[in-house]
Amino acid sequence: MEEKDVYTQDGTVDIHKNPANKEKTGNWKACRFILGNECCERLAYYGMGTNLVNYLESRLNQGNATAANNVTNWSGTCYITPLIGAFIADAYLGRYWTIATFVFIYVSGMTLLTLSASVPGLKPGNCNADTCHPNSSQTAVFFVALYMIALGTGGIKPCVSSFGADQFDENDENEKIKKSSFFNWFYFSINVGALIAATVLVWIQMNVGWGWGFGVPTVAMVIAVCFFFFGSRFYRLQRPGGSPLTRIFQVIVAAFRKISVKVPEDKSLLFETADDESNIKGSRKLVHTDNLKFFDKAAVESQSDSIKDGEVNPWRLCSVTQVEELKSIITLLPVWATGIVFATVYSQMSTMFVLQGNTMDQHMGKNFEIPSASLSLFDTVSVLFWTPVYDQFIIPLARKFTRNERGFTQLQRMGIGLVVSIFAMITAGVLEVVRLDYVKTHNAYDQKQIHMSIFWQIPQYLLIGCAEVFTFIGQLEFFYDQAPDAMRSLCSALSLTTVALGNYLSTVLVTVVMKITKKNGKPGWIPDNLNRGHLDYFFYLLATLSFLNFLVYLWISKRYKYKKAVGRAH
C-alpha cells in the first residue's frame, strides 16, 4: 500500500503530532465522540437559554421588553465571542486544544449559574407567587455567570463543527462525500440536545425549581467534556497556520506599497511557491481569481522586494495563495450579511414566541400545563424530521435534476431556508391577529391567559425548524468549504456572528419600535400586557425585512464564484 493511501493528504496529524493514519484516525469513528459532545453541550446551552426570558421575568423582576432584550443581548454575545476562540485556534492552539481550554470556563460558568439559582444569599429573595425582588449583588452574580458561559461557548462553538469536518480528508473523494453528510448529522445532534432541553429541562424549571433546572444542564456539560476527551486518540488535528489577521494585513500593506505597480496580464508571473505545497502551514494552494484585482499587486515581484537567504519579506511580497485568502474572506462577506435578518427571525423563538405563548391556554389535558418555552420542541422535531429527509431523500432526488453531488449548491440550499423563514413570520403574525381578535370579541384585555390553545403556535415553530435545516446547515457547510484551509475556525466564527448580529438587530428593532409606537400615551406594539399591543405588526415587519433580504441574497448569490484549491497542505 502506498504511503498516500495510508496517511491523509490534507496535512492533518494525530494527537501525538504524527501524520494521521487513515485507518486509525478520523472518519465516523472520531465523529461519534464529537457528535456526542455537541449533543450534550447544546442540551446544556439550550437547557439554560430556552426558558431564560421567563427566569428574568419571574426571578429578576424584569418586564417583557427588558427581559427579551437581555436574552437577545446575551445570545448575541454567545455568537460574538467565537471570534476570540477562532483566532486562538487558527493562529496558536489549533481546534482541539482551544476546545480543551475553553470547556473549563464553560463548566465554571454553568456551576456559578446553578449556585446563583439555588444557594441562599445568592438566589433572588423576597419572592411571592409570581415574582422575586433580587438585590443588586444577586443580579450581578447571575449575569457574571451568564457571560462566563458566553465566553466559554465562544471557544467551543467556532471550532467543533470545523473540527468534525477535519476528520474527513478532502483529497479522498469517498471521505469528501461523508463530510457533507457530517454537517447534517452534526445539526441533528444539536437538536437532539435542544429537544431534551425544551421538554424535560423546561418542565423541571417551571415545576421543580430553577436550582435543579440549571443543575441538570451543568451535569450535561460535564458529560460533554468527557465525550470530547474520550475520543482524543481517534482525532485528526489540523496544525495552526499562524495568525490569519497578520497574513491579511500583510497583503493589504504590500498592495498599498505597490499601489502604482501594474499587475501583469499573464497571472503566472505573480509570485507563488514553486512546489505543490503552500507556504502557509496547514493550507493548500488557492487558484488565482480575477476579482478584487487591486490585491494582486501584493503578489507582483519588484526590485524593491527584499529577499534574504531565499526568504521573502511578507510585508512587501505575498504569495498568490495568501492574496486569495483575503479575497475569499471579502467575497464571503455579502453572503454573510444576508444571514443577519434570518438570525433575527430565528431569535424570536426564545423571545416573542414565548411571550405570545404566555398569553394563551397552556393546558394539555385537565391536569398538565405545558410551559410556553417548551413549544420550541416543535422547532426541534421539525429539524429532526427534515435533517434525515434532506440527507436521505431530497439530495438523491435533487441530484437527478441538478447533477450536483450535493443535490443543491450550498447557496441554493440557504436561499430555500430564507424563503421558508418569510412564511414563518407571516404565520406568527396571522396567529396574533386571530388572538387579538379573540381578546377584542370577548373583552379579555386584562386576562393573563385567554381560552385559545397554545398549540396554535405549532405551525410557526415547524416552519422555523424547516428553515434552519436549509439555511443554518447550509451556512455551516458553506463557510467551512469556502474558507481558506488555515482560516476555517475564523470563517466558522464569522458565520456565527450572523446569529449575534441578528440578536442585536432584534434588540434594536424592539427598542426602536417601542420608542416610536409608545408616543401619545399609546401602549406600543410590545407592552407588558400583549393584549393591548400589536405584536402582529412586529411579526409583519420581520416578514417584510426577510423578503427584502431575500431579494438582496438572490442578487449576491448569482454573482458568487466558488473557490478552487489545488495541491496539498504541509
UniProtKB/Swiss-Prot annotation:
<dbReference type="InterPro" id="IPR036259">
    <property type="entry name" value="MFS_trans_sf"/>
</dbReference>
<feature type="transmembrane region" description="Helical">
    <location>
        <begin position="210"/>
        <end position="230"/>
    </location>
</feature>
<keyword id="KW-0571">Peptide transport</keyword>
<comment type="similarity">
    <text>Belongs to the major facilitator superfamily. Proton-dependent oligopeptide transporter (POT/PTR) (TC 2.A.17) family.</text>
</comment>
<keyword id="KW-0472">Membrane</keyword>
<comment type="function">
    <text>Peptide transporter. Mediates the transport of di- and tripeptides. High affinity transporter with low selectivity. No transport of amino acids.</text>
</comment>
<feature type="transmembrane region" description="Helical">
    <location>
        <begin position="329"/>
        <end position="349"/>
    </location>
</feature>
<feature type="transmembrane region" description="Helical">
    <location>
        <begin position="377"/>
        <end position="397"/>
    </location>
</feature>
<dbReference type="GO" id="GO:0009506">
    <property type="term" value="C:plasmodesma"/>
</dbReference>
<dbReference type="InterPro" id="IPR000109">
    <property type="entry name" value="POT_fam"/>
</dbReference>
<dbReference type="Pfam" id="PF00854">
    <property type="entry name" value="PTR2"/>
</dbReference>
<feature type="transmembrane region" description="Helical">
    <location>
        <begin position="140"/>
        <end position="160"/>
    </location>
</feature>
<feature type="modified residue" description="Phosphothreonine">
    <location>
        <position position="98"/>
    </location>
</feature>
<dbReference type="GO" id="GO:0071916">
    <property type="term" value="F:dipeptide transmembrane transporter activity"/>
</dbReference>
<keyword id="KW-0653">Protein transport</keyword>
<dbReference type="GO" id="GO:0015031">
    <property type="term" value="P:protein transport"/>
</dbReference>
<feature type="transmembrane region" description="Helical">
    <location>
        <begin position="182"/>
        <end position="202"/>
    </location>
</feature>
<dbReference type="GO" id="GO:0042937">
    <property type="term" value="F:tripeptide transmembrane transporter activity"/>
</dbReference>
<keyword id="KW-0813">Transport</keyword>
<feature type="transmembrane region" description="Helical">
    <location>
        <begin position="454"/>
        <end position="474"/>
    </location>
</feature>
<feature type="transmembrane region" description="Helical">
    <location>
        <begin position="494"/>
        <end position="514"/>
    </location>
</feature>
<keyword id="KW-1003">Cell membrane</keyword>
<feature type="transmembrane region" description="Helical">
    <location>
        <begin position="414"/>
        <end position="434"/>
    </location>
</feature>
<keyword id="KW-0597">Phosphoprotein</keyword>
<dbReference type="GO" id="GO:0005886">
    <property type="term" value="C:plasma membrane"/>
</dbReference>
<keyword id="KW-1133">Transmembrane helix</keyword>
<feature type="transmembrane region" description="Helical">
    <location>
        <begin position="99"/>
        <end position="119"/>
    </location>
</feature>
<keyword id="KW-0812">Transmembrane</keyword>
<protein>
    <recommendedName>
        <fullName>Protein NRT1/ PTR FAMILY 8.1</fullName>
    </recommendedName>
</protein>
<dbReference type="InterPro" id="IPR018456">
    <property type="entry name" value="PTR2_symporter_CS"/>
</dbReference>
<dbReference type="GO" id="GO:0042938">
    <property type="term" value="P:dipeptide transport"/>
</dbReference>
<feature type="transmembrane region" description="Helical">
    <location>
        <begin position="537"/>
        <end position="557"/>
    </location>
</feature>
<dbReference type="GO" id="GO:0042939">
    <property type="term" value="P:tripeptide transport"/>
</dbReference>
